[in-house]
């Protein structure tokens, strides 16, 4: 009778350990998915240290040049202030750009869609940053 209780107790402990292991694995998987959420298609994420990124600089200059052609404007590229990316069919870049309009510095927001494997780049939007908005 006593052996039966010990065997039952050991079996119960093994079941509890197995359940704890499964629960821990699921929790770790959920955390891993949450950690990678910014990498999923559709999520917009900040790009750090973008002032020195040559690709982003080139995209910002492209945005200003495209706007100048479409709007018959003469804005001069000054610097890239901020950048974000979103994975779509390619990459959508959300750029905050400082330009010079004559002698006045202004901030603009640009959206540039790029699909490098197709040699495709398109300015989707170019608009002034609203007064009081943070860059």
Swiss-Prot record:
InterPro entries: Cystatin, Cystatin_dom, Cystatin_sf, Prot_inh_cystat_CS. Residues 1-24 form the signal peptide. Belongs to the cystatin family. Phytocystatin subfamily. A motif (Secondary area of contact) lies at residues 86-90. Keywords: Protease inhibitor, Signal, Thiol protease inhibitor. The lineage of its organism: Eukaryota, Viridiplantae, Streptophyta, Embryophyta, Tracheophyta. GO terms for molecular function: cysteine-type endopeptidase inhibitor activity. Pfam families: SQAPI (PF16845). The record marks 42 as: Reactive site. CDD domains: CY. This is Cystatin-1. The gene is RAMDAZC7. It comes from Zea mays (Maize). The keyword RNA-binding does not apply.
């Amino acid at each position: 009778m006593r052996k039966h209780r010990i065997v039952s107790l050991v079996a119960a402990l093994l079941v509890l350990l197995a359940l704890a292991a499964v629960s821990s694995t699921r929790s770790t998987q959920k955390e891993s998915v949450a950690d990678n959420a910014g990498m999923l298609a559709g999520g917009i994420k900040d790009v750090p240290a973008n002032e020195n990124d040559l690709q982003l600089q080139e995209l910002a200059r492209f945005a200003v040049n495209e706007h100048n052609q479409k709007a018959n404007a003469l804005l001069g590229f000054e610097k890239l202030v901020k950048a974000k990316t979103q994975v779509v069919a390619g990459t959508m870049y959300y750029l905050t750009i400082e330009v010079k309009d004559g002698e006045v510095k202004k901030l603009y927001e640009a959206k540039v869609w790029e699909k490098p494997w197709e040699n495709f780049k398109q300015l989707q939007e170019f608009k002034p940053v609203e007064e009081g908005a943070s860059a």
